[in-house]
Regions:
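Transmembrane helical cores of multi-pass secondary ion antiporters/exchangers
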Residues: 1-421, 426, 433, 502-504, ...
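Non-transmembrane accessory domains of multi-pass membrane transporters/channels
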Residues: 287-295, 409-507
């Protein structure tokens, strides 16, 4: 069994890498192609069915994704847009679950509690796929912030509501007041726990002053934040997100530069792999979902899926437009009109209600038995959830780039990005001038003249490059200089390789020199990209 599991895991990782490469070449969203390929392989003959273990995803795969999203989230942006984020992450989730429960109760005669289970499962959108597309097309920052913030919090709302609904099915009812009190306790408790974990482990990392120990503590942080609240009856989501947000805000002051450099690569690879495997696993579940219903149930299942798909799309649009414009229409304060989003921005937020892994995990977590009886409508919940995920991810996800271009938000975002780039260059110029001022002080204090002169020429050259960029002067000389520098680094690499081959260098010395050359290569590419405005210098 262990051998089979290892082979399956290895095969999934390999297929994730190959499919991601194909998605890049085909210029389609990676998440969509991973789900499609996974679904196709699920029905391939002679291949074993792969059943997703929801506890495995919740305990091992979800915490690092949540924590990493929290670290990448701007705390200033989160605070600035807290109201719309909470309206979407809490209000829209509860509204969607309630309407789905009512509709399925009246149209499909589902018990109220079962309807709320289905509503809670399909209510939280997944921000991974739409965020990747929106960033690539330079959507305005405020939209990205709202979508990202919604994605951080809505999972917690949905999973807590899901646990209440499953409990109501088992017990036959639930107290609304009691549920509200429990919800408040969970929210406050998880935020407090997330802050405690974020503070303690971040300061422990700063105290350790050891890069490897810091990285181990960083990798343990999401699990330390998520697991205790989860096992105590909460969701764990808010705790992991809060720990990430705390690290995002205070990390730059406490994390060493070496750990930060290493963390970029470690976390980037880990999250890339986890996201890919999760979407691939989502596609692989299609066979198990399709084999569940009895032959006579298909018409009812398909009808339920159509109703739910239409509902979740329409409900989100209704909520988004109402939340955006009703407060302005009802407000007597004219200042409120100046912060009202455009209809294009509102439409895009409404359109990005793509469901993903949390919905699938919640559906698979529905127990098979309630006491001695089968859980009512479990197969229907699984089938409908998978249809909602597939239609929203493949349908809305594939159409999202065209919708963004049609609304003209790519042009708005491009202008905003250009303004942000100018601000970045201005900040870089100020930083270099501060370094030059400090260099003059050191020269006055008796610093070695030759070293100071070399450093001064280096910083003045960087200053000239960024001043030219800020003034709109052709950046071609900067790119040309970067190309020459990279050729020099390549020549140095070749020389080191030949000397190592001639046994003039030890392995340890070769690795030290290669690491220095790698850092120099990365610095040159980073600076060239920043000057040219390509992705703000991301490597």
């Amino acid at each position: 069994v262990i051998d089979a599991a290892l082979w399956i895991a290895f095969a999934m990782i390999a297929m994730t890498a190959l499919t991601s490469l194909a998605a890049r070449r085909m210029r389609v969203p990676q998440s969509i192609l991973l789900v499609v390929v996974g679904a196709a392989l699920a029905f391939a003959p002679r291949l074993p069915a792969v059943k997703l273990n929801p506890e495995l995803v919740l305990l091992l795969l979800l915490p690092p994704l949540l924590y990493y999203s929290g670290v990448g989230m701007s705390w200033r942006g989160f605070r600035k847009y807290l109201r719309p984020i909470m309206l979407m992450a809490v209000g829209c989730v509860l509204f969607t679950a309630s309407v789905v429960a009512a509709a399925t109760h009246w149209l499909l005669h589902l018990p109220w509690a079962v309807g709320f289970v289905l509503g809670a499962v399909v209510s939280p959108p997944d921000a991974v796929a739409p965020m990747a597309i929106a960033r690539r097309l330079s959507v305005p920052k405020r939209i990205l912030t709202v979508l990202e913030g919604e994605g951080l919090v809505n999972d917690a709302t949905a999973l807590i509501l899901f646990s209440f609904a499953v409990g109501a099915v088992a017990t036959g009812g639930v107290s609304i007041i009691g549920a509200a009190e429990t919800f408040a306790i969970i929210v406050i408790g998880e935020i407090a726990w997330g802050l405690a974990i974020g503070w303690s482990l971040l300061h422990l990392r700063a105290w350790s002053k050891d890069t490897e120990v810091e990285m181990i503590l960083a990798l343990l942080t999401p699990f330390a934040a998520f697991w205790p609240p989860h096992f105590l009856g909460g969701s764990g989501v808010l705790a992991a997100v809060t720990a990430g947000l705390y690290t995002s805000w205070h990390g730059p002051k406490l994390i060493s530069p070496a750990t930060r450099l290493q963390g970029f690569f470690v976390w980037g690879l880990a999250v890339y792999l986890v996201e890919g495997v999760v979407f691939f696993l989502t596609g692989l579940q299609s066979r198990l979902v399709m084999e569940g219903p009895d032959a006579g149930e298909w018409s009812r299942m398909i009808g339920a899926a159509i109703i739910t798909v239409v509902l979740v799309v329409v409900i989100r649009f209704v909520w988004v437009f109402a939340a955006a414009y009703l407060p302005t229409l009802l407000s007597r304060n004219n200042d409120a009109r100046r912060v009202t989003p455009t209809w294009q921005e509102t439409f895009l937020v409404g359109f990005t209600g793509i469901r993903g892994v949390v919905s699938l995990v919640a559906a698979l977590s529905v127990p098979e038995m309630v006491g001695t009886e089968p859980f009512p409508e479990r197969d229907l919940i699984l089938f409908v959830t998978f249809c909602v995920i597939l239609v929203s991810l493949v349908g809305q996800g594939a159409a999202l780039p065209k919708v963004i271009e049609y609304l003209g938000l790519d042009k708005t975002g491009a202008a905003e990005a250009e303004s942000a780039k100018r601000n970045e260059v201005t900040a870089r110029v100020a930083g270099i001038r501060a370094a030059l001022d400090r260099l003059k002080q050191l020269m006055g204090e008796g610093a070695v003249a030759r070293s100071a002169a070399n450093l001064r020429r280096l910083h003045e050259g960087r200053l000239t490059d960024f001043v030219h960029t800020s003034e709109g002067i052709d950046a071609a000389p900067v790119a040309e200089a970067a190309g020459i520098q990279l050729q020099l680094v390549a020549a140095e690499r070749a020389s080191i390789a030949s000397q190592y081959a001639a046994e003039k260098l030890t392995d340890e010395a070769r690795r030290r020199i290669e690491r220095e050359l790698d850092l120099e290569d990365a610095r040159i590419r980073h600076a060239a990209d920043s000057a040219a405005g390509n992705g703000f210098g991301e490597i």
